[in-house]
Amino acid sequence: MQISDTGRSHTPDFHAVLAREDWHNQTITHLNRLPAHPVFASWRDELAARDNLPSSRRRQLDGSGSSLTPAARLPSMRVVTQDLPDCRGTPVPSNWQMEGYDAPIYTNVRYPIDTTPPRVPEDNPTGCYSLHFTVEDTWRENGQTQIIFDGVNSAFHLWCNGVWVGYSQDSRLPAAFDLSPFLRPGDNRLCVMVMRWSAGSWLEDQDMWRMSGIFRSVWLLNKPQQRLCDVQLTPALDALYRDGTLQVQATIEATEAALAGLSVGVSLWRGEEQFAAGRQPLGTPTVDERGHYAERVDFSLAVATPAHWSAETPNCYRAVVTLWRGDELLEAEAWDIGFRRIEIADGLLRLNGKPLLIRGVNRHEHHHLRGQVVTEADMVQDILLMKQNNFNAVRCSHYPNAPRWYELCNRYGLYVVDEANIETHGMVPMNRLSDDPAWLPAFSARVTRMVQSNRNHPCIIIWSLGNESGGGGNHEALYHWLKRNDPSRPVQYEGGGADTTATDIICPMYARVERDQPIPAVPKWGIKKWISLPGEQRPLILCEYAHAMGNSLGNFADYWQAFREYPRLQGGFIWDWADQAIRKTFADGSVGWAYGGDFGDKPNDRQFCMNGLVFPDRTPHPSLVEAKHAQQYFQFTLLSTSPLRVRIISEYLFRPTDNEVVRWQVQAAGEPLYHGDLTLALPPEGSDEITLLDSLILPEGARAVWLTLEVTQPQATAWSEAEHRVAWQQFPLPAPLGCRRPPCLPALPDLIVSDEVWQIRAGSQCWTIDRRTGLLSRWSVGGQEQLLTPLRDQFIRAPLDNDIGVSEVERIDPNAWVERWRSAGLYDLEAHCVQCDAQRLANETLVDCRWHYLRGEEVVIVSHWRMHFTADGTLRLAVDGERAETLPPLPRVGLHFQVADQQAPVSWLGLGPHENYPDRRSSACFARWEQPLAAMTTPYIFPTENGLRCDTQALDWGRWHISGHFHFSVQPWSTRQLMETDHWHKMQAEDGVWITLDGLHMGVGGDDSWTPSVLPQWLLSQTRWQYEVSLRSL
């Protein structure tokens, strides 16, 4: 780029700037903003650039030395030159809603303002930031000093020392301005006037909190008079994936006279070892009849057998690009690069020749205390958690992330889909702006600047044109621009149907494994069917799937079975990473996590912002364990039981197993019988068949026999501690046949009869059944009462988010499970005891009770309990029942009762240790588990059914001992309180602890959260049932 020697033109005054109303104009995406470029540091030493040492020419302005003047509308001109009396110290970066100004708004689809594009409300909250700084004389006297804002929401005008500098919109990409003409000795003052709403807001309708302010870092950068203004680095591998080339394109900014004698050098390093270097004078070959680019240089370096970059092996090189005048170094810039080749071949997305399996997740930039301000420590925390839980990819949903994010993904190893900051979900139709050429400049700026800013990062393997904006000519045009300007990466875009001509990858959201969703104009086929449609040859990667809202992620293992079975189903990105809740002190003084509506924000979409695999503070949900297991890199097959042989397959594409040990154990009823370990030595994509035991000999009477295998990493890695578990699997083994001897019981329990109760006594045990209600109302041991409530049938659960769907008070969805249960009267059934008989049998006393559950006058459920009391203090309870066919499938069939709290851990023989449900239990293992009572609850922010453990054979908690085959939960919260409480921090302590025993429990679903997503096999569709449990209290 050539620059002239002339001075700066006259700048408009404050009133003229505001009179233009740039924030209402979608064609004005910026004024005086510098062209987008990769992150610069302007080192003046080549080795400092190589070693990424702090640059004296780049200074961060973050901190508390700034002030903010809030206004409901545009402020007076005094803010340009002075801090007003109502200004307040405000940290930069921050969202001003998190600092006590204005309210955050959470909406999913609906725009938070009236839909009148491109204009926005006249009442437009505006914050004027005042930032003070000083610069060295050398910065003012030589070169160019830039101010760089990494992120400002949503648009801003900039003044320096009272003089207008420029304007920018697009809240998620850096905006740089030349401050050189405005600087003065000593103190310099910036005024940044930030508007909450702008024309750009119509392109930023993402499912997130709507916040404002300077929320990313601010930098000062001093570049020399002749300077690098853009550098594009394209590492590539040859067709054999053996040797590499580094293609370099650099653009210089200087006067025409100064261009002569300049040259650009490139050196490539790993640590202190140099692998390649070259230098070339400015000027390109002739382009056309008008000549060549005098200010640009294009050349390549050959690199023999470079180490490849992948998420498994993130081998980074340091590319140092230098600008020279003769032998004088003017400037050095440097970036981490990686040699890898992304291509779509034979219908498969391939990296370095191998088909990828995307273990992905969508991630918003969100922090529960700081809003959308995310620090490097926060980023590292997310990356480590993702890597530890077998994720290899992340989609930047739905906007480019802070620049440091990509640098970290390069180093730690994550594949990134970089997505343009474009979403118009609330438009009707959705493509209203996408198909309007008047909006092409705004669309174009967001896509092209994203690419120009981020294209040097090896972690970015796919560009995305945005999210949920429909299909239109603007996206078509930008697809073709991308294919011309960066042919090294594929492009994806879901809008308009997920398989349009503007995407290289079929990338639907929430398509099911099998079931079609024939949505008008944009049908979603089952993913197996989609790849088999006539003429369709593209890979399919779900840009969003497995909506992880609250207690969810059912059916997740089904997706991964399909991914492994069909090569062109190459994975997907779970929605989403973290619950977007905000820590708040509520009006009553309580502190908890807030969601939509908790700040008086209207419109709002309530708790729909909480779809994470982790809580806002990054504490994992149980569903994260399910995701980790389904995505694990090792697969296991049981080949035979005697000898005990298994096959282990590595799904690593690029790394051998150089830090993996297999540990195995055979257990019977939770007791270890055999165990061992061995070192895995597998090549990439390798497998091995291993004999664990030559002969499996089990003791007589052994039951519940399981083989457990797990792969751990003995040595710490860059992203995990030593002994990190990366994979595990269980297999049931056949148990030897055996006959159980019936117990030798003492005398029969006594049966004491009165008009009101049946009373059964056996030693210190005393049970009391109310003959009117049929309920076991009292159970005393040694005169001490055990029950706080009677044992009762339980047919309901506190509705999950997936049960509620989109149903709200003002907008009922009759298809939602909660509405079907409500309209069927399930929450208001009346129990009437129609039978309560007692008799003494040969070895026990039997109480036989039957209840009719009425909906009005109609019997809709019949429940029959046979309570067998034995002299050893055992209650064996056999339950059978049936429901009317007019009732929808029930959420559960079981019983519950409340008992006094005990200071004892909960121990069980069954699936665990984490919460699991019938359609989300692949990751749970059968064993003897023990956990404190507090760990048996999952405190979902919006309270719901939680804490279940499935397929249990024995439960022991203090004096309580329960056996049979059942699912259970033990927690200090009643179903009723869970149903009636809208935030977890409002849950109140109850008198005791509730034990729930389920014979049957419906799945949780999770393909999405707005349609009934529980698969048929996990519905309680049967109209008859039976189960049996035995209870003892000692």
Curated annotation (Swiss-Prot):
The active site is at 468 (proton donor), 544 (nucleophile). It comes from the Bacteria. GO terms for molecular function: beta-galactosidase activity; carbohydrate binding; magnesium ion binding. This is Beta-galactosidase. Disulfide bonds: none annotated. Belongs to the glycosyl hydrolase 2 family. GO terms for cellular component: beta-galactosidase complex. SUPFAM superfamilies: (Trans)glycosidases, beta-Galactosidase/glucuronidase domain, Galactose mutarotase-like, Galactose-binding domain-like. The gene is lacZ. Keywords: Glycosidase, Hydrolase, Magnesium, Metal-binding, Sodium. Its EC number is 3.2.1.23. HAMAP family: Beta_gal. It is an enzyme of class 3 (hydrolase). One of its GO terms (biological process) is lactose catabolic process. Mg(2+) 1 binds at residues 423, 425, 468. Its cofactor is Mg(2+); Na(+). Na(+) binds at residues 207, 608, 611. Substrate binds at residues 108, 207, 468, 544-547, 611, 1010. It catalyses: Hydrolysis of terminal non-reducing beta-D-galactose residues in beta-D-galactosides. Homotetramer. Mg(2+) 2 binds at residue 604. The keyword Magnesium applies. NCBIfam families: PRK09525.1.
